[in-house]
Regions:
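Conserved, mostly hydrophobic/aromatic
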Residues: 4, 45, 68, 116, ...
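Glycine-rich phosphate-binding active-site loops on the catalytic face of alpha/beta enzymes
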Residues: 6-10, 63, 67-78, 132-133, ...
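Generic structural signal for well-ordered alpha-helices
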Residues: 24-32, 54-58, 110-114, 139, ...
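Short beta-strand/loop segments at the ligand-binding rim of alpha/beta enzyme cores
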Residues: 36-47, 118-130
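Active-site glycine- and acidic-residue-rich loops that bind
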Residues: 41-67
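C-terminal helical cap(s) of enzyme catalytic domains, especially alpha/beta-barrels
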Residues: 79-98, 143, 156-180
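Extended, intrinsically disordered, low-complexity segments
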Residues: 106, 169-192
Length: 192
């Protein structure tokens, strides 16, 4: 799988980073170019720095994306060093913006996943969910809103790979307690 990151908040400049994800024409252009160069499945990673994620998501699918991934980090200024009056982290004075991730972004991620899953033009398009997943319950919520897979990065960086085993164990217990035999039985259950 190739995941096209149309949402990196660390790249600043017109037509770069998360700006790509806000422009359906650029999303379509880069998705089509990627599809032309590979036979691997292509996911378009959407930016949360937008009001209606469905618009660029639809452009990605029309251009050939095999699925969507959401969400990336939220563009932010983490803090200001009150001694130097520069942003932190400061990379040669050129990095005032960064990406905010972790548990706090989960409700935002779920909202965007919900919107895309309900969009008529995106019906049947696989979604890989991410954003604030720390526990099996978090992962299950993304699945319940229609995600076929989930991705976990910040939590692994914070707590180590052990959390993956805990997620698997928790999900197995949940399935058994609820008479289910496959995680696929939870996908989309929270959708109308």
């Amino acid at each position: 799988i190739i995941e096209c990151n149309f949402s990196c908040p660390q790249m600043v400049g017109e037509g770069l980073g998360s700006d790509v994800g806000t422009d359906p024409q650029l999303v379509a252009k880069y998705t089509a170019a990627t599809k032309k160069g590979t036979t691997l499945p292509v996911l378009a990673k959407m930016t949360p720095n937008i009001t209606k994620m469905e618009v660029p998501a639809e452009a990605a699918v029309r251009a050939g994306a095999d699925g969507l991934a959401a969400i990336n980090t939220i563009k932010s200024v983490m803090n200001i060093n009150l001694q130097t009056f520069s942003s932190a982290p400061d990379v040669d004075g050129k990095s005032p913006e960064g990406g905010y991730s972790g548990k706090a972004v989960k409700p935002i991620a779920l909202r965007f996943i919900n919107d895309m899953a309900k969009d008529e033009n995106l019906k049947g398009v696989p979604i890989s969910g991410m954003g604030g997943i720390e526990t099996w319950r978090d992962a299950a919520e993304f699945l319940a809103l229609g995600c076929e897979t989930v991705q976990v990065t910040t939590s692994v960086m914070q707590y180590g790979y052990r959390i993956i085993g805990e997620m698997i164990g928790g999900m197995q217990d949940y399935l058994a307690q609820n008479g289910m035999t496959s995680v696929r039985q939870t996908i989309g259950k929270a959708l109308p």
